[in-house]
Amino acid sequence: MENDSAQHVRFQNLQEDQMTFNQVFEHIVAFMRSRPAGNYRLIVGTDSQIHPQKTIFITGIVIRNKGKGVWACIRKVTVPRKMLQLHERISYETSLSEEIVSLFTEERKRQLIDIVLPHIYQGASFSMEGHIDIGAGKKNKTRKFVQEMVTRLEAIGVEPKIKPDAFVA
């Protein structure tokens, strides 16, 4: 049974449209069960694009098995105005990622960990990352927001990654 916050959220990829979060989670479980001794990274990240009358946000969920493939999907959110303030846009990107991360409840995370757990001594692993579309370089306009956004993701229990390591955002 889906919780209330997950019922309105829809995802898509090249194979399926209008997936619920439960369907997404089942795809992730099936992907991991196909090779339970894998090195898995569950990654959530959001990027945005400003258009003349709107700003489009794309949140990606990627489950990656190092050297063995990925399964991924996206969620698209449209804000009906140009979000020109950089801090507002970066903060909203982070909020959308936080929303999706929150759908991975402790019970769901435990279910994913339990897939790889019997294979830990053979090198299996599982981690969860939040990718943020910001960088710490001296010329990067987003560098002043790094600490704030990193702290937000750490607070919800995911490992934050920034550019150039944040490839999902």
Question: Model-derived features: where do they sit?
Answer:
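Acidic helix/loop or adjacent segment enriched in Glu/Asp that either coordinates divalent metal
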Residues: 79-116
